[in-house]
Amino acid sequence: MLRKRFLLLFIAAAVGIGLLWIEDYTTAQTQENIESASLLPDYYGEGLRNRSYTEEGKLEREVMASHSIHYPAQKLTELDEPKVHSIDNDGETWVLTSILGFHYEERKTLVLQQDVLVTPLVELNSGTPLQNSIRTTELTFYTEEQLAKTDKPVEVLSINGQINAVGMIIRLDQQKIEFLSQVKARYAP
């Protein structure tokens, strides 16, 4: 009789341990699925256009892209061919374009990468070759401050000359540019 009770106790313990193992295994699998699902995008977009206005109701900035993918877990939006129209205090529109862009929601920044171009909208719409342009490989645009920064090499071309530098800060709302290092300029009036 004692052996039957011992055998019954052993079988009950084995079944209990087996059920606990199955629960732990399925919980781990479910958690992995939830984590991998949160890394997936929640929407894709074609022809993105986003406008921001000042408190007075004036257009401050417009962001456009041919394609966008939003990742909610990272609070990140990837943009293809982003184009930013930033309007300065005098009403002039500056255009920032690149091949790729990454909008970080928490930092309120837009990182433009690959063939970044900054130029006045008037020149882009004129149909003539650009007379004033700024080129670099990467530029971080701080959307709230209307400020753009890079630590990469920069080339500024104008009708009268050329400036090469490493790093710059552009205050788009004030039309001011500060070059950070290795500045070389050529001017021909």
How should these model regions be labeled?
Residues M1-P189:
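Mature-chain termini and adjacent capping regions
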